[in-house]
């Protein structure tokens, strides 16, 4: 999963859409006071194509992926640093940060641009599958030798 933000649109009849605005959370959003609202998930996404070159579901503009909100007690799988793997067996819940450059979960960071949130660390694995995206070809493949964590948000 990747962190997402959620904003309530302005109360105008000309907005042209109903519902909240959801988008990918980035580290520069911390300055504006945004918080992580949830994480994107693959399961339950419909009509997202996979191809032999790109076996990971990819959605273009206008398509949708599901997301789960923080506080719903859902368990999600996220890419994590080896420092998070080292936390296996420690007490829960814990504070974590999101490394937006490497798109991975890291132990809590005191950096002013850190995206920090609380979660329960359920399980870690050093041989999990995460998405590897190639900016040049536009293909996404599974990296099956990555560190992953199952967290309850």
Where are these regions (language model features)?
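Surface-exposed, low-hydrophobicity beta-strand/loop segments enriched in small/polar/acidic residues
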Residues: 1-153
């Amino acid at each position: 999963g990747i962190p997402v933000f959620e904003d309530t649109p302005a109360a105008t009849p000309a907005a042209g859409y109903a519902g909240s605005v959801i988008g990918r959370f980035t580290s520069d959003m911390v300055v504006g006071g945004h918080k992580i609202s949830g994480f994107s998930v693959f399961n339950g996404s419909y009509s997202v194509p996979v191809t032999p070159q790109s076996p990971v579901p990819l959605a273009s503009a206008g398509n949708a992926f599901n997301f789960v909100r923080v506080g719903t007690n859902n368990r999600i799988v996220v890419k994590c640093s080896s420092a998070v793997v080292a936390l296996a067996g420690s007490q829960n819940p814990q504070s974590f940060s999101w490394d937006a450059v490497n798109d991975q979960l890291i132990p809590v960071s005191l950096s002013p641009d850190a995206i920090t949130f609380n979660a329960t660390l359920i399980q870690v694995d050093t041989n999990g599958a995460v998405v590897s995206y190639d900016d040049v070809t536009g293909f996404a493949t599974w990296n099956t030798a990555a560190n992953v964590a199952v967290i309850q948000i």
